[in-house]
């Protein structure tokens, strides 16, 4: 006879909220304690939905922090490096993104140089529809939506210049399916050269 497992929805909800609290870094949520110590694009958008269930103001702060990394051309990078960490490679120094990529005169954190699937628009819409609208002004939501629109326009212009309706992915990490076996065959055909030494950090944590 199979064992019967009974899950209390409220208990699971509180456990999930505790994980968000533990991974809160003062305005953004890290996916894991050490393995992923920065703010990841679509992870953060989904975390905002979790925050909204018990702290609407914190949910919107998550979005604000993510958008601090937006480039001048509208691209929203897949990692925003709000602080340094020895536990992750490649870090901001490896990406070495030029200052010219960012709006002039605006303080910003370092970022990676690739993007991720744009789930942010859907998440922001859900935040707005489910929220009480007491922690954010309409004018700020409009500004957030304009930034997201600029990101979508970047996908259209930079990743679909021939207007095919299909967005090009330049790196497996941009797909959100980093370790999918679907990448094995195409990546095997890419010539590789190693011009610098490096040490992976994640293998010591998993």
Residue ranges, per PLM feature:
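Low-complexity, Ser/Thr/Pro/Gly-enriched N-terminal "stalk/linker" regions
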Residues: 1-39, 60-61, 65, 72-79, ...
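Generic anion/oxyanion-binding catalytic loop in active/binding sites
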Residues: 36, 48, 109
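Short, solvent-exposed loop/helix junctions and linker helices
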Residues: 38-41, 114
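Conserved H-X4-D acyltransferase segment
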Residues: 40-54
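Short amphipathic alpha-helical/adjacent loop interface patches that line ligand
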Residues: 44, 63, 152
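Helix-terminus loop motifs that line ligand-binding clefts
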Residues: 56-145, 156-173
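Extended ligand-binding clefts on enzyme/binding-domain cores
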Residues: 142, 152-206
């Amino acid at each position: 006879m199979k064992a019967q497992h009974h899950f209390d929805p409220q208990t699971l909800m509180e456990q999930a909220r505790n994980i968000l609290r533990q991974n809160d870094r003062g305005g953004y949520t890290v996916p894991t304690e050490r393995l992923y110590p920065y703010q990841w694009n679509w992870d953060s958008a989904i975390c905002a939905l979790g925050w909204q269930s018990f702290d609407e103001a914190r949910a919107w702060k998550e979005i604000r922090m993510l958008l601090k990394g937006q480039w001048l051309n509208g691209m929203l990078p897949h990692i925003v490096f709000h602080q340094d960490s020895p536990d992750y490679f490649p870090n901001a120094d490896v990406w070495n993104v030029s200052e010219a990529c960012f709006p002039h005169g605006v303080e910003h954190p370092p970022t990676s140089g690739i993007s991720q699937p744009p789930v942010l628009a859907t998440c922001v819409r859900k935040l707005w529809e489910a929220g009480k609208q007491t922690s954010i002004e309409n004018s700020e939501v409009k500004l957030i939506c304009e930034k997201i629109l600029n990101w979508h326009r970047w996908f259209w212009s930079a990743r679909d210049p021939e207007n095919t309706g299909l967005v090009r992915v330049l790196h497996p990490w941009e797909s959100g399916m980093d370790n999918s076996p679907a990448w094995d065959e195409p990546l095997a055909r890419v010539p590789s050269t190693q011009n610098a030494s490096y040490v992976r950090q994640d293998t010591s944590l998993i």
